[in-house]
Amino acid sequence: MAKPALWATTAGLNSPRRDPVTPPPAAVPAEARAIGGWRRLALWPFALLLKLWGRSLRFVTTPEDLRAFTKHDEPVAIVLWHNRLFLSAEIVRRYRQGRPAYALVSASQDGAWLSAFFSLAGMRTVRGSSSRLGREAATALVGVLRAGLDVGITPDGPRGPCYDFKPGALIVARRTGAPLLLVGAEFESAWQLRSWDRFYLPKPFSRVIMRCTHVPASALDQREAAAVTIAGRLRAINPDVRKSGGGPPL
């Protein structure tokens, strides 16, 4: 599965703001593949299905976590495990006021399909990955944060191992001084794919218990130590990480 590691919603960089902010367009590397024509059109029914699927889910959270999710006075780096990415669009829509969202996807052919899908689902994309075109991708993410937008990071993407927190995931937040919002999700009923991350597909209309932890920028000064601490906190709010599996794979 290609890596969607970023989504962005408007939030004030130095002061609270409620009006949408349009970030400067990130340059798409020349090597990035694209999908167009009938192939793009063929994705539309699938994108609509997944949007309706996501909206059917029943998110449950505590008042404290809800306040952290919906705090908009500064941009944050939202961190969640790769196998929770199905929830990303709904997190933006429900908790980040549904503002325009950005997804970082690979510059490969697989990423081209994912980029086209995200576009049809109402999300915009930045192309790049940790393995190819990484410098351009990092620069684009920094630009998004400095424009006053949130970014999302999957610290075990794009190829795993599953739940292996890579210290490099903190680079963008450290360069901009943005705090982290660690996201946890516990599924009442879900399928899991036979992918490297055992990707979760919550069953329609099922309940998802959402958790989050706010980490201030000051806690990121020492990258290696911060990565160990943050990885532990992210595992703590995702209970299945401590289990051998979360359900029968598809």
Enumerate the language-model features and the residues they cover.
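Residues that cap or initiate secondary-structure elements
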Residues: 65-67, 84, 109, 159, ...
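Non-catalytic C-terminal accessory region of glycerolipid acyltransferases
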Residues: 2-55, 98, 120, 124, ...
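Catalytic core of membrane glycerolipid acyltransferases/transacylases, capturing the structured
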Residues: 74-132, 192
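Short amphipathic alpha-helical segments and helix-helix/interface helices
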Residues: 66-70, 115, 169-170
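Generic preference for hydrophobic/aromatic residues in regular secondary structure cores
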Residues: 58-64, 100-103, 210
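Conserved beta-strand termini and adjacent loop/short-helix elements that scaffold enzyme active sites
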Residues: 62-64, 106, 128-131, 213-215, ...
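Short hydrophobic/aromatic-rich motifs at helix boundaries and adjacent loops
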Residues: 18-19, 36-39, 60-62, 85-88, ...
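A short, well-structured juxtamembrane/interface segment
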Residues: 51-75, 84-88, 93
